[in-house]
Amino acid sequence: MFGKKNLKWLGVVATLMMTFVQLGGALVTKTGSADGCGSSWPLCHGALIPEFFPIDTIIELSHRAVSALSLLMVLWLVITAWKHIGYIKEIKPLSIISVGFLLLQALIGAAAVIWQQNDYVLALHFGISLISFSSVFLITLIIFSIDQKYEAAELYIKKPLRRLTWLMAIIIYCGVYTGALVRHADASLAYGGWPLPFHDLVPHSEQDWVQLTHRIMAFIVFTIIMITYIHAVKNYPNNRTVHYGYTAAFILVILQVITGALSIMTNVNLIIALFHALFITYLFGMTTYFIMLMLRSVRSDKQ
């Protein structure tokens, strides 16, 4: 059960399941299904199996089921990884983070159901689960030795790119929070047209301010990633990890901006909104991979 031969498929399945957790959370919020099981948790309407199954109950129950299965799968993965490749420096801390933040995400989700938290607290939910996803994602990359391929093993990231990448990670995370707040505050269609309602630029409600803040953060995210991408490909032209990685990040942020704009233009089409959540999930995952490589460069400085 915990054999080394299981590591690769466990990593892939756990990463996919964590992706579905992210998308499921976005689906619950977008469809207003957070109260699909009433104020009961872990039961649904006070029962293990509810009497009726309206669509919001099905969506909420499905999200809970996927979250529970993902916890079991992540536990299986981290125990197996700890046992067989725990000698790799990053595996143990990543294992602790992945399980710890997944449990924290579940607790915040439960608190939201039972005590009806305010929007600003609920917006933390997506970001916390994103940290857990990224930890599982990194464990999977290590299992497949991606961190040793494409000149990654001999890569030394200098201070300018380190600073830009840290800034990129912080700004993305702030953008994630404001995006989650847009969903929870029911502000997806606030503040008029995209990119700005030029006929009336002054926000008139809390929802307008939430939406405007997210658009400003999205613009900053795009700008910082573009600057980081240009710096990376210009200064590391012969390193495929940097070239491919930061190019992928730049493509993902472009797709993120496009789906964000289309969400508004289509009155929040559900499929587009889910792609919007998917792209930011993998963009943040890519950024944490850069951070892992950067921390290795920092350790080499100290040796």
UniProtKB/Swiss-Prot annotation:
The alphabetized UniProt keywords are: Cell membrane, Disulfide bond, Heme biosynthesis, Iron, Membrane, Metal-binding, Oxidoreductase, Transmembrane, Transmembrane helix
Q: Which reaction does it catalyse?
A: Fe(II)-heme o + 2 A + H2O = Fe(II)-heme a + 2 AH2
Which amino acids does the record list as binding heme o?
H63, H125
Parts of the chain on the Cytoplasmic side? 1-8, 89-93, 147-163, 237-244, 292-303
What domain of life?
Answer: Bacteria
Swiss-Prot/TrEMBL cofactor(s): heme b
Any one Pfam family here would be COX15-CtaA
**MF GO annotations:** metal ion binding; oxidoreductase activity, acting on NAD(P)H, heme protein as acceptor
- Record flagged with keyword Transcription: no
Membrane-topology descriptor:
Multi-pass membrane protein
Which segments sit on the Extracellular face?
30-67, 115-125, 185-215, 266-270
Chain segments annotated as transmembrane: 9-29, 68-88, 94-114, 126-146, 164-184, 216-236, 245-265, 271-291
Per the record, the major location class is membrane
What pathway or pathways are given for this protein in its record? Porphyrin-containing compound metabolism; heme A biosynthesis; heme A from heme O: step 1/1
Please state which protein family the record places this protein in: Belongs to the COX15/CtaA family. Type 1 subfamily.
Q: What is known of its domains?
A: The N-half (TM1-TM4) and C-half (TM5-TM8) domains are connected by an intracellular loop. Each domain is formed from four-helix bundles and they align in a pseudo twofold symmetry manner. The N-half domain is the substrate-heme O binding domain and the C-half domain is the cofactor heme B binding domain. The cysteines of disulfide bond Cys-37 and Cys-44 may be involved in transfer of reducing equivalents from quinol in the membrane to the active site of the enzyme.
Query: How does the annotation summarize its subunit structure?
Result: Interacts with CtaB.
What functional role does this protein have?
Catalyzes the conversion of heme O to heme A by two successive hydroxylations of the methyl group at C8. The first hydroxylation forms heme I, the second hydroxylation results in an unstable dihydroxymethyl group, which spontaneously dehydrates, resulting in the formyl group of heme A.
Q: What is this protein called?
A: Heme A synthase
According to its UniProt entry, this protein's organism is: Staphylococcus aureus (strain bovine RF122 / ET3-1)
The record's gene field reads ctaA
